[in-house]
A protein has these predicted regions:
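Bacterial N-terminal signal peptides that target proteins for export
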Residues: 2-17
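Amphipathic, heptad-repeat alpha-helical segments
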Residues: 29-60, 67
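Helix-capping and short linker residues that terminate individual alpha-solenoid repeat units
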Residues: 48, 52, 75, 94-95, ...
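Charged, low-complexity interaction regions
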Residues: 52, 79-82
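Short, charge-rich amphipathic alpha-helical segments embedded
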Residues: 79-80, 90-105
Length: 105
């Protein structure tokens, strides 16, 4: 009988330790999205050089808004959100680039 209680105690202790470990892992912040931020800035710069400010202003504005949001999230140490917004900024900048190149045809 005592062995069974001890086994239950060990099982509970193990479950608690496992849960604590999982919680600590989920609380860890990811690394800052340095590369994603750089990619977004470069894509916006290329789109501007291609004339997106005149030819694809809607897409360029969306890219700049996402980049601004990413910068705020980065400053707030919300790295997952910053990474997402930076990737969106790059995608919108590439849309602006494509739209500005299409309008040249």
């Amino acid at each position: 009988m005592q062995l069974t209680e001890f086994n239950r105690f060990l099982k509970g202790l193990l479950q608690t330790a496992l849960l604590a470990g999982l919680l600590s892992l989920s609380a860890c912040e990811t690394a800052p999205p340095v590369q994603e931020m750089s990619d977004a800035r470069q894509a916006i710069a290329v789109a501007k050089e291609a004339g997106a400010a005149d030819k694809a202003a809607f897409h360029l504005k969306a890219a700049e808004d996402y980049l601004e949001s990413a910068e705020k999230a980065l400053n707030d140490h919300e790295y997952s959100e910053a990474r997402y917004d930076a990737k969106q900024a790059k995608a919108k900048a590439l849309d602006a680039l494509k739209a500005s190149e299409t309008s040249n045809d």
